[in-house]
């Protein structure tokens, strides 16, 4: 798949999957990713804050193989070096990570670069720095990070839907019960981290989320 083809995924009504072993009720990242892929998720971000770099490398290699088998994308959180080493499709950078323009010099044009954003200025700066997409959030209160940013709210989602120069992934506190609000505000690609990884039945939860997404796609 070309880079252009990969980036089209970020503008469709779809789920951006993300690992979060801390919230996975004893299930490993590998187990969860297998279910995500088997349930139709085509973008996986490997995010792991509590393991050594060597452990992350080993897991990433295994997840890369899985994503290739399912013709899905692998985005590595934070680590441009790990992204290169495992042959991932791209890297996702936080506001405290290396600047996107410098990472672009390191990785070249073929890799996807995403940037976490909370404000209009950060979205515009990400475009200026050569990012390919942004993560926009947290839309609602979220507890997956140690020091979470205050919720940006649905008004920011509406602004991004109308004005963002880049595709965006709505993230943060998104649940099955509020997903329709997020989509009605203009989001298409969404990430519901704990709603998925913490579900008793991950496959069933993903099916429910996709059902809502498809209802908006048809409307």
Curated annotation (Swiss-Prot):
The cofactors named for this UniProt entry are: Mg(2+)
InterPro entries in UniProt: Aldolase_TIM, ThiamineP_synth_sf, ThiamineP_synth_TenI, TMP_synthase
Q: Which Pfam families match?
A: TMP-TENI (PF02581)
How is this protein named in the record?
Answer: Thiamine-phosphate synthase
A Gene Ontology cellular component where this protein is annotated is: cytoplasm
Q: Does the keyword Metal-binding apply?
A: yes
Q: Which UniProt keywords apply?
A: Magnesium, Metal-binding, Thiamine biosynthesis, Transferase
Q: Which reaction does it catalyse?
A: 2-[(2R,5Z)-2-carboxy-4-methylthiazol-5(2H)-ylidene]ethyl phosphate + 4-amino-2-methyl-5-(diphosphooxymethyl)pyrimidine + 2 H(+) = thiamine phosphate + CO2 + diphosphate; 2-(2-carboxy-4-methylthiazol-5-yl)ethyl phosphate + 4-amino-2-methyl-5-(diphosphooxymethyl)pyrimidine + 2 H(+) = thiamine phosphate + CO2 + diphosphate; 4-methyl-5-(2-phosphooxyethyl)-thiazole + 4-amino-2-methyl-5-(diphosphooxymethyl)pyrimidine + H(+) = thiamine phosphate + diphosphate
Which sites bind Mg(2+)? 78, 97
* UniProt gene name: thiE
């Amino acid at each position: 798949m070309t880079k252009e083809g990969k980036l089209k995924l970020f503008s469709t009504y779809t789920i951006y999957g993300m690992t979060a072993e801390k919230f996975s009720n004893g299930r490993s990242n590998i187990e969860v990713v297998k279910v995500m892929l088997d349930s139709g998720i085509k973008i996986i971000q490997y995010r792991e804050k509590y393991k050594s770099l060597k452990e992350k490398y080993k897991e990433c290699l295994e997840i890369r193989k899985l994503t290739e088998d399912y013709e899905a994308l692998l985005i590595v959180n934070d680590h441009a070096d790990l992204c290169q080493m495992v042959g991932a499709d791209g890297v996702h950078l936080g506001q405290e990570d290396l600047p996107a323009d410098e990472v672009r010099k390191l990785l070249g044009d073929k890799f996807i670069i995403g940037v976490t954003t909370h404000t209009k200025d950060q979205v515009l700066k990400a475009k200026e720095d050569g990012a390919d997409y942004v993560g926009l959030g947290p839309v609602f209160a979220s507890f997956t990070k140690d020091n979470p940013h205050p919720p940006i709210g649905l008004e920011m989602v509406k602004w991004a839907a109308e004005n963002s120069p880049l595709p965006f992934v709505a993230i943060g506190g998104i649940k099955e019960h509020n997903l329709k609000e997020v989509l009605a505000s203009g989001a298409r690609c969404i990430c519901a981290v704990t709603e998925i990884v913490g579900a008793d039945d991950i496959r069933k939860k993903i099916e429910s989320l996709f059902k809502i997404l498809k209802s908006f796609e048809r409307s």
